Amino acid sequence: MRKVAFVTGGSSGIGRCTAIALRQAGCVVYEFSRRDNPIEGVYHIGVDVTDEAAVHAVVSRITQDCGVSILVNCAGNGISGAVEFTELHDAKAQFEVNFFGMVNMSKAVLPYMRKQGAGRIINISSVAAVAHIPFQTYYSASKAAIESYTCCLANEVKPFGISVTCVQPGDIRTCFTEARRKSIVGDDVYEGRISRSVEGMEKDERNGMSPDEAGKYIAKIALKPHVKPIYTLGFGYKCLSLLCKLLPCRLRNWIVGLLYAR
């Protein structure tokens, strides 16, 4: 029987490429996003993942018809700017999409996965979860929250045959860069450090890995028989993630500051 996969944020970027890779691997794929950007052979579900009631309604309808084997939580966005000048509603909106959107989808599929005694949930984090990027504070914090959530949930649902894992991409060439909500309010007070930091990040992203490669990697993990709690995408970022874990916090933060807070 073909596996049924749900992919959020499937209209563009990593989510779209993951949906395509899972379809090519033989899965029945449903992509969940607000915007319809048709993919041949993939079913589009128009929903906002931050709308808990809508998410539960549509997941209930689909799972009753065909079940669910895999959930990939790719939906996300980014904001940048100095914490001092970031409006609280913008910070909360960042968490609503990146973190609570993932929570809504996970909670919706868990009862069905538990009853069938199997399932795989993949949450997309970021290397920014371990290399905490200044002037991307709320983005980094939301991704760190995803990793904590993933590890906790993995232990909670393991007895039911459900595995939960997290993928840390580094810089990826997608429309995420252009879609980021940038604010340079206070750049004069911070002596140009906000704009320099964001420009540096965006340069790295434009020179990053292709989303096709990222999507194939995520699809491969989705179909593995067993998974680790966290995967890092790309050799260089695997080394960076390992260094962040091994280096003393003070030294690690000093190095990140040299790169992104000067």
Residue ranges and their predicted role:
Residues 11, 19:
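N-terminal Rossmann NAD(P)H-binding glycine-rich loop of SDR-like oxidoreductase domains
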Residues 126:
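Residue(s) in the substrate-gating loop at a strand-loop-helix junction
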Residues 82-83, 90-92:
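Substrate-binding pocket helix/loop in short-chain dehydrogenase/reductase
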Residues 159-228:
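SDR active-site lid
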